[in-house]
Amino acid sequence: MLSLDVLLLCAISGFQLLISADGDPMIEVFKWKQLDFYNRGDGYKDLWNRICIPDSHFYNSRKCLGSSSSGSFIQYNNVPQGVTHFRGRLFVTVPRRQPGIPSTLNYIDLAKDGWSQSPHLRAYPNLAVNQYNASEQNLVSVYRTSVDVCGRLWFVDTGMLEFPNNRQQIRHPSIWVIDLANDRLLKRFEIPQSIVEIGRGLASITIDVGARRCNDAYAYIPDLVNRRLHVYHLRSDRIWSFEHSFFNFDPLSDNLNIGGQTFRWDDGIFSATLGSYKPDGSRDVFFHPMASTNEFVVSNRVLQQEFNAARSDHGDDFHLLGTRGPSTQSTMHKYDPRTGVIFFAEVQKSGVGCWKTSKPFSTENHGSVYSNSSEMIYPSDLTIDEEGYIWVMSNSMPIFVYSKLDVEKYNFRIWRQSTLLAKRGTVCE
């Protein structure tokens, strides 16, 4: 009998499941020429969900449907960035880098909309929370999300509108924690100005927590602009920042050619992922700048001690693992405990790479899972869900920034594959 997960995959990917059976490492699940929403905030109503149930844990949640206080809907400006799956819901973020974005945090209900090739997005938890003019408790701009082992959705609201030539820091950046069992806000922590003055560099968040110690969670937040690694501790409700030269971009790796666009980006530390538990209970934290082909590592024990952040010299606590090889610049990466493999979203290769952590870190041991320069243009996010499936978002961002998207072609895609199949046939087996 097919498992529920396999049946769900059949429903949302159709014939492409047969391609996977022949060894294709990534399955294209959804694709869009342009994004659309069940509630654009312009009077276009949610056809599936006209009845709104208020949530007392979110400010003014009765305004689930209706007009937007965040400006008129401009479809072309909506570019997805992050993707995270949890138990039938696929969370999709749309940072406010341009005007006309109705909701920055959204989801796809796979049971209701998984049949569609280009499903409409639903505002999460509702449209009201996504209206940044309504309340300081509402969302401005979210890049990526993360789900921890306690079933909580974590993300950073940058608090910034990144409109070209008109950036506005609407409010301080903040860390949000939502209980996905009931969609209630558990925590909103406003990041002090002494830690971060502007929020546009806070593009990802990684959660370090045990299933039986949910209140003792640590969040690692790379800051690609200020080249820092921020650490937030949930139980003490405190945050501190590490600085290190390893957080800087590599000037020899900042020249990119993606989607026919040639440009230079100086993005510093971009992604952090946790390795397996060691006998002493510690875990390695692997990290890298986006404009770099190097990988670095530090123990989580180092990061979790606030007094360590004040040191002027970190000694040998931070280590260079080595280089992944030419053209392996990566946005996000994620460790999979089932296979012991780290998977990388590789922007220059328009694909997914891998490294098996039991092998020496070297160019020879860095494998290629998938590469497609015409369809997986700029893989902006890569996550792994609790069932062992990789999810990748590709969004053609360089074309959007430096040229013009062809709205008659598919520009945004979400991909999926099990980690067991993804590593098959590579040096990561």
Swiss-Prot record:
Cellular localisation: Secreted
Glycosylation sites (chain numbering): N133, N372
Keywords: Glycoprotein, Isomerase, Melanin biosynthesis, Secreted, Signal
Enzyme Commission designation: 5.3.3.12
Signal sequence bounds: 1-23
Catalytic activity, reaction form: L-dopachrome = 5,6-dihydroxyindole-2-carboxylate
One of the record's GO cellular component terms: extracellular region
Pfam families to which the protein is assigned, alphabetical: MRJP (PF03022)
UniProt keyword Phosphoprotein, yes or no: no
Similarity comment: family membership: Belongs to the major royal jelly protein family.
Protein name: L-dopachrome tautomerase yellow-f
Lineage: Eukaryota, Metazoa, Ecdysozoa, Arthropoda, Hexapoda
